[in-house]
Amino acid sequence: MNKLFSRIALSALLLGAPAAASAQSISIDAANIKGTISPLIYGAGAEDVNHEIYGGLYDQRIFGEGFEEPEAINIEGFLPYDEVWSVKNGVLSINTSNHGKLVYQTDYAKGSIEVEMLLGGGSPIAGLIIDVQEAGNGADNFRGYEIALNKNTGHFVFGKHDHNWQPVQDFATTFSVSAWNTLRVDFDGAKATCFVNGVQIYKNSDTATPLLHGMFGLRSYGGSASFRNLKVNGQPVAFKQTAAGISGMWYGVGNGKYTRVNSGFTGKASQMIQGTTGDGIRNLGLNHWGINIDKDEAYHGTVYLRGTADKVRVALQSKDGSREYAAQEIDGIKSAWKAFTFDLQPAASDSIGSFVLELASDGYVVADQVLLCTDSYPFRKDITESFRQQKLTFLRYGGTMVNAEEYMSKDMIGPRIERQPYKGHWYTYSTNGFAAPEFVEFARLIGTEPAIAINIEDNPQDVLAMLKEMEPYNLQMLEIGNEENLFTAARPAYEHYVERFKVLYDAIHRVYPDMQFIHAAWWRADELETMEYVFHELDGKADFWDFHPWTETPQQAKDVENDIKNMQSKFLQWNPDTKMRCAIFEENGNTHDMARALAHAYMLNNVRRSNGFVPLDSPANALQPYQQNDNGWDQGQIFFSPSSVWNQPPYYAQQMAAETHQPLLVESELSRMSNIDVTATRSEDGKTLVIHAVNYGTTTGNLTLNLSNFGEVKSIKRLSLSGPANGENTPMQPRLYVPVEVDVEVGSKLRLNAYSYTVFVISASDVLGMEKHTADYPDDKCYDLAGRLINDTTNATIIIQNRRKFLK
């Protein structure tokens, strides 16, 4: 066959001084189609971890809407984070399976802290934290050094927190896992000397990025712990507790009497306010950060009330109540629960404002289910717009939140404000005001394909009732469970999952035969006998097997390609005719920086090369509040505060890929390259070629592109995202790392930055025809790209693929 070639030279741009580079090339045959690429690989995964939903996407400005949080416990001199701390007989305790810290509100540059500690239930890693700065809610949301004991391993642990976890030392030492131990640290700036039960066991000096002063605190991660006999510089500090009678996300206003009532309109609690005019409660939104009040925005609300007071007053105020922006009185309160609505138009803006509910006459009221929202309810407008601009094609609502016992579909339908709250995995006092139906509605609103996950113990009829409510949004994908048996390889656990999958599948499939099902049994490449059992049991029922790789760096993403190939190989070995494929519903990591962006870009190349075996891909997590970090999941793509939204490098990597999607993978071959990964894709009409290049090296490689069977090049566009591996965007510099788009003169050298994801879009003015064919192609029949025989080839453009003639 005669071939016509169009050649373009590509070179790379260095970050900093240029380095000598050997000749490197990529050869692309635009006519040799290697596979098809699903349009649904540009996804994102969301669940209510880090308050992505409640406090984030959900346009409910009140946090603690139903007063489910226990009453606030004040411990003199300390400020608590995450969980509730309590004091009994001088012993301070935290009862949790998650994490919490208690920070003493005095700054020290040097000193000595000593405490006796008893490790409790669960798997606690507990102890002291020093040089604490910038503390907030979230497991790693602070700066400081940690000195701790690990109950499970019997190890001493020393590490640094910088809104993340940086392990420094972890070694076995002698202490009791069932009795009191004495932990002490002597510190001078970033120098620390650590003692366990009076024995010096470790010294550390941080000279790289030292923290020279800060507060100290007590912390437990992964389980419960108790503390007593605290000494600061040898002087006892007593744990003294007072209770205000107010649910933990609210503050008292005035001098009223407050009681958290153990019943409510919904849920298990409500809030009583008793006193005179002006006595009330104040809410500051998520994490007490403040509610954004915009004078150009109308605010609407609902509150359920009962009581003896004739009327109450609702208001938008400054954080401390010194300024008021809008107010409205509510009357007609009776002894039975009744919903009251209100509208507030603020006279001024305040990015850290508050909402107040107070008595406007003597008596008492009991309040429950307080809603404050804007016209965009139930979706926060600025976050919605950021989602829309990312050009996602797929959204998954699922994750560990699904595994919570109370995560049940029966509580997710009906009027939002009347739904029952539930005990969540990531946040104990979770709301169903935003649940799976709202997420499906949201996905359709921004033009993406939704998938949701359900609890494997859910009732089939309840799930069907929820799906019925979702019918206007045409949900097509349903996952049963999430990461099932992640913590056990036991065969009976997998058998139970298979049993529950079938129960739910059979009921749902009968009513929704076109629904696609995803199963969530945890894939274990080292337990193939069990994997084969699951495969045979669910083959023909489950359309996809959910796979969650760890992809924090490009190097880790590179290794995943073999995992995908091995998975596909096993599927075909177990059943050559299987239609089950792989869905990557979570690419996971602990970061949201440039390294994570390049890792995702590399993963997309892996997925493209899978030739449709992986038609769905969604990195976690879709969004995250600034300085909110639960359990290390510091991996949001969209970041937000109460008043602003900005995007991280992985967001832009996904946006670049989605904007330049083409459906056909064409042959590409790299020569003499390291730390660079490339795929080439093409439009169906053959007029657009897209190159996705991931350069995860710190130096450049000069690329020469050898392009065959493509028309005359009309234009070239380059999109490039680059920066240091740890580069991320902040509220102060929200666009520090964003894609740069340039038009490149045809025929000139193109430049690929070091440590970058770069997309080249090459357009042709026409498509090369194949008027002469050699004996290599004896068949005169022609086909379309889907493999269908075409009889009329008049005015057709012929291409060659796998020794057969195809036309466009």
Per-region residue spans from a language model:
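C-terminal outer-membrane/trafficking sorting elements
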Residues: 22, 765-808
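Aromatic/acidic polysaccharide-binding cleft in carbohydrate-active enzymes
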Residues: 48-49, 583-681
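Short carbohydrate-recognition loop motifs
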Residues: 83-100, 111, 155-159, 259-280
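Short, aromatic/His-centered strand-loop micro-motif at the edge of beta-sheets
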Residues: 162-182, 328
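Flexible glycan-contacting loops in extracellular carbohydrate-active proteins
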Residues: 204-226
